[in-house]
Every structure is written in structure tokens, then in C-alpha cells.
Amino acid sequence: MSTPFYVSPQQAMADRAEYARKGIARGRSLVVLQYADGIVFVGENPSRALHKFSEIYDRIGFAAAGKYNEYENLRIGGVRYADLRGYTYDRDDVTARGLANVYAQTLGTIFSSQAEKPYEVELVVAEVGDSPENDQIYRLPHDGSIVDEHGSVAVGGNAEQISGYLDQRHRDGMTLAEALKLAVQALSRDTNGTEREIPAERLEVAVLDRTRPQQRKFKRIVGGQLSRLLESGAASADGEAETEAETDSGSDEE
């Protein structure tokens, strides 16, 4: 009778984490940014049928990178949780923090169970508040941990490089056009540092807009509206570049 092959618990967990990270890295990156009037979700997604971003409840949005069937199951579970809690108690009792805790328990249980493989997903749960100070953004990696994010967050294949780019350039009070332009610039940068162009038809964009009069703040941005915002953001960026150039020129003359 042969001796069973022994793997230490630490090595087993490390192998599962590496497996999940590699699966997530194969997915396209996405970013979530705060702007003056809410939170914007931006990702490269050539499919018109499969969405990376979805509404969970009135003020809560969901974003995910990784295996579609796995994060779609989580999304559906989140919608059911939110609907049941809002119906049983009150709509105000449905929060991003509560939903993030539910997702963390699910992901953590699956990750630590040897009976099934870990989920190859990374989630973002965001809730728009009455003011930017009350916005909430939570990132949930494959192991079920919760990271409280502020300003911007990136998940997916090139998340580390994109996060560094956003941290240097994102600022409070940006307009939607400015935030969208910054997000596209960040997503356009490849791992080798080169920049490529992402056409509007390959972008998936959604917002949680605190200024909407409706109770539901989630809205997708498509078609002509998306094109106009991209053009507006480009014009704003060009104007800032010209202003900086004139300032530098004036300083040289002095």
C-alpha cells in the first residue's frame, strides 16, 4: 500500500491562491473611479451580451473580473440577498458593506474548502452616497478578504500597473468626462508600457449617479452619450496640456 502524498496546509493554500490569481489575470482589467457626482465603472468588453458591471440595488453597483459563470452566480446571489433584505426590513438597510460581507463569506468558504476549486474572480462592490465623502467602494479578492478602497480601484489582468497609474492622476472633484478619459487612458496601457487605442464600441461604461432623481442610481452609458463624453474628456485634457505649456513658457521668459 503506497503512502499518500503529503502537502502542507500552507502549500495547499498557496497553490490555490496562485491558481485563482492566474485565472483572474487572464481576464480583461476594469476600473472603478469616484467623480464629483458619483462613481463610474469602465472596462474593455467587446461583448454586448455579457456585462462586467451590473446594478445590485438602488445605490449599489457590482463589477467583476475573471470567469463569467462564477461571478454571474455571485451577482445573482447578491441581487436576491438585497431584494430579500429590502423587502423584509427596509430599503435603507441594504448597504454595500453588508453585501461585501456576504460575498466575503461565500468566497472565503469556497477558497478554504478542499472539496472544490477556488473561484477565479475578483469583485468590486460600490455604493454611491449623498456626497462623495459617503461613497463606499469595496474590493474582494478571490480569498474573501475585503479591501476598503477610496478614489479609484482596478481589478483584472493588469490591475497593479493600472492602479499605480490611477493613484498618480486621479483627484477629487473630477467631472464624469475627466474620470472617463483617465480610466480609458489607464486601461489603454499595456504591461510593456506602450499605449493602444480602445474604440468606444469596445468599452462598457456605467455610473452610479447621485444626482439622478430616481431612486435607482445605476445607469449604463452607451452610444452617442459615450462618444460625446470621450470627446469632451479629450478636449479637456488638451486644454490642460496647453495651459501647462503656456505656464512653463512664461516661467522660462522670466
Swiss-Prot record:
Keyword Cytoplasm: yes
GO molecular function, one term: threonine-type endopeptidase activity
Region (Disordered): 231-254
Keywords tagged on the record: Cytoplasm, Proteasome
Temperature dependence: Optimum temperature is 55 degrees Celsius.
Protein family (similarity comment): Belongs to the peptidase T1A family.
Role according to the record: Component of the proteasome core, a large protease complex with broad specificity involved in protein degradation. The S.coelicolor proteasome is able to cleave oligopeptides after hydrophobic residues, but not after basic or acidic residues, thus displaying chymotrypsin-like activity but not trypsin-like activity.
Name of the protein in its database record: Proteasome subunit alpha
Gene name tied to this protein: prcA
